[in-house]
Amino acid sequence: QRQMCIRDREITEEISYLESIINAIEISVTEADLANIKEELIETGYIKRTVKGKHKITANKPMHFVSSDGFDIYVGKNNIQNDELTFKTGNGNDWWFHAKQMPGSHVLLKTDGKEVPDRTFEEAASLAAYYSKGREQEKVEVDYVLKKEVKKPAGAKPGFVVYYTNYSMVADTDIKDIKQL
């Protein structure tokens, strides 16, 4: 019984991971985006490397937006970028956003120690909604939390995190008015 529960959890995590890969493919814009996803699949053992040795992938940066109030907002395009954004970019008092209970990009709102207006929170949440599996819906529920509250379990696949929050909002998936750099 216990082994079955453990196996069920592993299968659920595997499905969630593969859904995150599908989402990353769907929001890919360039060949470099797809190359990053392929490299991740090689590193996680889903596909075999066709050329011997470690293949160097061109550095591919997260998407960068600026809110109406002048705050920088970054959006990961794949699981590796999501990990980079969440654990190596910004500081603990920046805000982290993610579509609730569905695959999607990690979104980081850099505060630089300033008070963040509601409109900027809404724009960051809209980016998390749009760059998620829910992008075809008009509205998506988005969780947000201080970056320092987001943790990566030991041995977790790229892009997988845990967080506990009482903060969520329903966000519009329309991002046409948010300036991308």
Language model: regions and residue ranges:
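Domain-scale macromolecular recognition modules
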Residues: Y46-A124
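Hydrophobic alpha-helix feature that most strongly marks membrane-spanning transmembrane helices
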Residues: S16, N23, D112, S126-E136
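Intrinsically disordered, low-complexity regulatory tails
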Residues: Y131-L181
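Short, low-complexity, polar/charged sequence segments that are solvent-exposed and flexible
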Residues: G92-W96, E115-V116, S126-Y130, V161-Y164, ...
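Short, small-residue-biased leader/transition segments that mark boundaries at the very start
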Residues: R2-I6
